[in-house]
């Protein structure tokens, strides 16, 4: 599987990359806007933080296919190897098809249904990103959407993969992986929740207490 961080916070990427076996970083326009930095300044810094082998994702802003393709080429020229995120609208599907012919790797984003995700994959997107928590918030079942999409891709578009996004809890992320999802991207707060387990700290403190009581030190 592949684990990504969904952020434009370079310092946090550097910190968590030392801990997590991350494959790269995903961003979107809202994440970039929240960073208060120009996309052309923050993307190179993020790429440096994840290393040459790390995969970086950034999204186009245009609403029409030709504009999406133009922006995708601009992103590719700025960051060779970048994966361009394209919203899965009718214009987005047209752009994904054109970018496939141009050799630019894409991710179909803003996916709210398995059918929508399958169309993105068939159009040529290497990655498809269902929005798990947002589907739940609209009264749907985000995990079931991932299960259905994963099954559809395995049958009809095996060269594409699910990269699930939009998580509020570690449980949602784990349920996606149990559903067969190959990749997930975690916001910083969810990634941190995976690390913060009070019971673990209590167990370690007990070990230290017992060891110190017996040997007068907390080291070997």
From Swiss-Prot:
It is found in: Cytoplasm. One of its GO terms (cellular component) is cytoplasm. Its main location: cytoplasm. Its EC number is 4.1.2.-. The active site is at residue 85. Transmembrane segments: none annotated. Pfam families: TAL_FSA. Belongs to the transaldolase family. Type 3A subfamily. Catalyzes the reversible formation of fructose 6-phosphate from dihydroxyacetone and D-glyceraldehyde 3-phosphate via an aldolization reaction. This is Fructose-6-phosphate aldolase 2. It comes from Escherichia coli O6:H1 (strain CFT073 / ATCC 700928 / UPEC).
């Amino acid at each position: 599987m592949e684990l990504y961080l969904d952020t434009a916070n370079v310092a946090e990427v550097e910190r968590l990359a030392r801990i997590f076996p991350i494959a790269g970083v995903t961003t979107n326009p809202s994440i970039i806007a929240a960073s208060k930095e120009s996309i052309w300044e923050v993307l190179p810094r993020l790429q440096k933080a994840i290393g040459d082998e790390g995969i970086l994702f950034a999204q186009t802003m245009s609403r029409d296919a030709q504009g999406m393709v133009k922006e995708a080429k601009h992103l590719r020229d700025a960051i060779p190897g970048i994966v361009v995120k394209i919203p899965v609208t009718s214009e987005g599907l047209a752009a994904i098809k054109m970018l496939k012919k141009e050799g630019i790797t894409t991710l179909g984003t803003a996916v709210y249904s398995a059918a929508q995700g399958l169309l993105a994959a068939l159009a040529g997107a290497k990655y498809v990103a269902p929005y798990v928590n947002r589907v739940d918030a609209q009264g749907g079942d985000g995990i079931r959407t991932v299960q259905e999409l994963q099954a559809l891709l395995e049958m009809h578009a095996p060269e594409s993969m699910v990269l699930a996004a939009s998580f509020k809890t570690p449980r949602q992320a784990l349920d996606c992986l149990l559903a067969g999802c190959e990749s997930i991207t975690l916001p910083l707060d969810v990634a941190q929740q995976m690390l913060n387990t009070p019971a673990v700290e209590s167990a370690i403190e007990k070990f230290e207490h017992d060891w110190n009581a017996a040997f007068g030190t907390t080291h070997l």
